[in-house]
From Swiss-Prot:
InterPro entries: PIG-V/Gpi18. Pfam families: Mannosyl_trans2. This is GPI mannosyltransferase 2. One of its GO terms (cellular component) is endoplasmic reticulum membrane. It is found in: Endoplasmic reticulum membrane. It is an enzyme of class 2 (transferase). It comes from Aspergillus fumigatus (strain ATCC MYA-4609 / CBS 101355 / FGSC A1100 / Af293). GO terms for molecular function: alpha-1,6-mannosyltransferase activity; glycolipid mannosyltransferase activity; mannosyltransferase activity.
C-alpha cells in the first residue's frame, strides 16, 4: 500500500483557525483591519468591474462623449474607472472637473468636489472606540476591533469605493468625533487648554464634513449639548471667568460648524443672485438657500413628499438600518448598564467621562433616522449611516454578548450574526446593481 499524506480534519481546522487569527486578530488591530479593508474593497471592486455593458443608464458616458452618438461606441472601449461613476457621482465628477455649472449641482457637497479621494475612516473609528470604551481588557479590545471591522462592510457598500461623498464624510465626521472625545478626556483630567484646542479642531472637522454632506450639521448637537451643560453652573454659581471662557469656546465651535453649511450657500448666492441676470426664485427667500431649493425642485425632497405608494419598496429596503439606528440610540441611553458591561477591572474616571458621549451621539443618530424616514429619499439612509459610529458599537456589543451566551446555552443562531451576514450580502448585491447603473441609489 502506497504511503499518502492525509490532512486530517483537525489539522484543516487548525489551519483555518491560524488563517483566521492572521486576518482577524484584535491584538494586532491596525494590521488586521488593514487586511480586512483591502480584501473587502478588492471584492467590491471586482464585482463592479465585471458588470457587463454601459449599464441601464448611460449618463456616465456623457463625461467622455458629451456630443457623440453612443450607438457607434464600443462598450469595451470605456475605461473601467467609469464603472464607479454612477448616480450622484456623475455630479461630483463633473463639478470637480468643470466647477459648479448647473444649479442642481449645488445639492452636492461643495467640499468634496474640491478633494476627490478614496479615504478610509476605519482606523480613526478604532481610535475613537478606544477613547469611549477603553482598550485595556480583552472585551474592550474586541469591541473596538469589531466596531471598526463593521465599518468596513458598511451597508454603504460601493458608495464608499466610488467618487461619492460618503467616504470623505465618514473620515471627517468620525475624526471630528475622535477629537471631541479626546477633549472630553482632557476635561476629565483638567487639561483645559488641550481640551479647548481639541474642541475647536473637532468643530473644524465636523464643519468640513458638513461641507461634504449637509447632514454633518447634526454634529452641532454636541456643542448645543455642551452649552446647555453650562447653565446649571451659571444658575448656581453665577458667571465666572472659567465658565465664560468655556462657553465662548463652545459657541465659537458651533459657529464654525455652521460655516460648513453657510459658506457654500453664500458662494452660490453671489453666483446666482448678485448678477445682472434675472435672479432665481430662492434669492428672495428670508434665508436664501440654493441647497433647499434644488432639493425641492429637482428631487422633490421635503417633509412627507416621499410618502407615496410606489416608494413602499424603498421604505422596506431602508427599514432594517432605520430600526438599527433607533435601537442603538435607545441602547446608548442605558448608560449605567453599558458602563458596567464594558468597564471591567475598575474603569478610571476619564473613561467613565468619555462614555457620557453616548447619549449625545444617540440624539444625533435618532435625528438622522427620523429625518430620513420623514423628509429624505429614505433609501439613502443605507449609505448615510456609514459615518455614524453608534450603531457599529451597538452591533459589536451584541455580537460579543451573543457569542458569550451561545457558549453557555449551545445556541447556534445569533440575531446579531445574521444582521452582519445580511449587511455583507446586501453590500455584494448592491455592488452588482451599482456597477450596472441600476437602483437603488
Amino acid at each position: 500500500m502506497s504511503r499518502m499524506t492525509v490532512l486530517s480534519p483537525s489539522a484543516g481546522s487548525q489551519s483555518a483557525c491560524s488563517l483566521g487569527l492572521i486576518l482577524v486578530n484584535p491584538r494586532r488591530p491596525l494590521r488586521s483591519l488593514s487586511i480586512l479593508f483591502g480584501l473587502w474593497k478588492a471584492l467590491i471592486f471586482l464585482v463592479i468591474v465585471i458588470c457587463p455593458g454601459l449599464g441601464y443608464d448611460t449618463s456616465t458616458s456623457l463625461l467622455l462623449y458629451p456630443t457623440r452618438d453612443l450607438s457607434d461606441v464600443d462598450p469595451l472601449h470605456f475605461p473601467l474607472s467609469l464603472r464607479f461613476v454612477r448616480w450622484d457621482s456623475i455630479y461630483f465628477v463633473h463639478a470637480a472637473e468643470h466647477g459648479y455649472v448647473f444649479e442642481q449641482e449645488w445639492a452636492f457637497g461643495y467640499g468634496y468636489t474640491r478633494l476627490l479621494a478614496l479615504l478610509a475612516s476605519v482606523l480613526v473609528l478604532y481610535r475613537l472606540s478606544v477613547n469611549i470604551f477603553g482598550g485595556d481588557t480583552a472585551k474592550q479590545k474586541t469591541l473596538c476591533f469589531l466596531s471598526a471591522a463593521l465599518h468596513i462592510i458598511s451597508p454603504a457598500g460601493a458608495f464608499l469605493s466610488a467618487p461619492y461623498g460618503e467616504a470623505l464624510f465618514s473620515l471627517l465626521n468620525i475624526s471630528g468625533l475622535y477629537l471631541y472625545s479626546s477633549s472630553v478626556l482632557d476635561a476629565a483630567t483638567n487639561h483645559r487648554l488641550s481640551r479647548d484646542l481639541k474642541l475647536l479642531a473637532a468643530a473644524v472637522l465636523i464643519s468640513a464634513a458638513t461641507a461634504v454632506r449637509s447632514n454633518g450639521i447634526l454634529g452641532g448637537v454636541l456643542f448645543a449639548y455642551d452649552a446647555l451643560l453650562q447653565l446649571p453652573q451659571i444658575l448656581s454659581r453665577g458667571l465666572s471667568l472659567a465658565v465664560v471662557s468655556r462657553l465662548a469656546v463652545i459657541v465659537l465651535g458651533g459657529c464654525v460648524i455652521a460655516l460648513g453649511m453657510a459658506v457654500p450657500q453664500y458662494i452660490a448666492f453671489n453666483a446666482f443672485c448678485m448678477t445682472s441676470n434675472a435672479p432665481r426664485p430662492w434669492c428672495g427667500w428670508t434665508i436664501p438657500s440654493i441647497y433647499r431649493f434644488v432639493q425641492e425642485k429637482y428631487w422633490n425632497v421635503g417633509f412627507l413628499r416621499y410618502w407615496v405608494v410606489p416608494n413602499i419598496p424603498l421604505f422596506l429596503l431602508a427599514m432594517p438600518i432605520l430600526a438599527l439606528l433607533l435601537r442603538s440610540a435607545f441602547w446608548a441611553w442605558r448608560l449605567p448598564s453599558v458602563t458596567s458591561k464594558f468597564s471591567e477591572n475598575g474603569a478610571n474616571g476619564a473613561l467613565t467621562k468619555a462614555m457620557w458621549l453616548l447619549p449625545r451621539l444617540a440624539i444625533i443618530q435618532a435625528l438622522l433616522a427620523v429625518l430620513a424616514f420623514t423628509s429624505y429619499h429614505v433609501q439613502i439612509i443605507n449609505r448615510l449611516s456609514s459615518g455614524y459610529p453608534l450603531w457599529y458599537w451597538y452591533l459589536a456589543a451584541e455580537l460579543i454578548s451573543d457569542f458569550k451566551n451561545s457558549q453557555s446555552t449551545n445556541k447556534c443562531i445569533s440575531i446579531s450574526a445574521v444582521a452582519v451576514q445580511a449587511i455583507m450580502i446586501y453590500g455584494l448585491i448592491h455592488a452588482v446593481l451599482f456597477g450596472s447603473f441600476l437602483p437603488p441609489a
